[in-house]
Design a protein with these regions (language model features):
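Asp-based phosphoryl-transfer active-site loop
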Residues: 23-42, 133, 166
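Basic, amphipathic juxtamembrane/active-site segments
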Residues: 41-64
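Short coil/turn segments at beta-strand junctions that form active-site/ligand-binding loops
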Residues: 25-27, 70, 118-119
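Mg2+-dependent phosphoryl-transfer enzymes with acidic/Ser/Thr/Gly-rich catalytic loops
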Residues: 51-55, 88-90, 94-96, 103-188
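Substrate-recognition element of Asp-dependent hydrolases with the DxDx(T/V) motif
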Residues: 36, 62-86, 96-97, 133
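Short secondary-structure boundary segments
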Residues: 33, 77-78, 99, 143-146
Length: 188
């Protein structure tokens, strides 16, 4: 993209050249859970068990990212066994639960994976996510994120959290890196 202000047409709508340029360099995608991978609702069973719904299209996008050399990590404020199980199913090995200060987990990931902040994308939905989002190369807010987060993000998804917003981000990263066609036809 040579012209400032130019954009790329995607199946999700136009994406600015600046966002595409940032997405080209991403090697680690960090995701929140509640409000990003799920719709933010927590269902409580009669025996106190916690239930959440996860979108299979998000799962497919995550698997495509992982098989295209983009690491995926979860940093979430809550702790739930079902999140651990979902990560195991998808092949996500970097899971940080119960994080009231997400910067601690973020710093640990950077050190563990030897990745610079500019090579990280973070997808969040609420103000707890902003301290990490302001440090990464590509900050993403889901469409239904907190109103104060949306204008601060580099990119806002067209799709709401829990409704395949993560898939939109994965597709964007793969498209920017010229890997989207390679990801077609994979199975999860």
């Amino acid at each position: 993209m040579s012209k400032a202000g130019a954009s790329l047409a995607t199946c999700y709508g136009p994406v600015s050249a600046d966002v595409i340029a940032k997405a080209e360099n991403i090697r680690l995608l960090i995701l929140d859970v509640d409000g990003v991978l799920s719709d933010g609702l927590i269902y409580m069973g009669n025996n106190g068990e916690e239930l959440k719904a996860f979108n299979v299209r998000d799962g497919y996008g995550i698997r495509c990212a992982l098989t295209s050399d983009i690491e995926v990590a979860i940093i979430t404020g809550r702790k739930a066994k079902l999140v651990e199980d979902r990560c195991a199913t998808l092949g996500i090995t970097h899971l940080y639960q119960g994080q009231s200060n997400k910067l601690i987990a973020f710093s640990d990931l950077l050190e563990k994976l030897a990745i610079a902040p500019e090579n990280v994308a973070y997808v969040g939905d609420d103000l707890i996510d902003w301290p990490v989002m302001e440090k990464v190369g590509l900050s993403v807010a889901v469409a239904d994120a907190h109103p104060l987060l949306i204008p601060r993000a580099d990119y806002v998804t067209r799709i709401a959290g829990g409704r395949a917003a993560v898939r939109e981000v994965c597709d964007l990263l793969l498209l920017a890196q010229g890997k989207l066609d390679e990801a077609k036809g994979q199975s999860i």
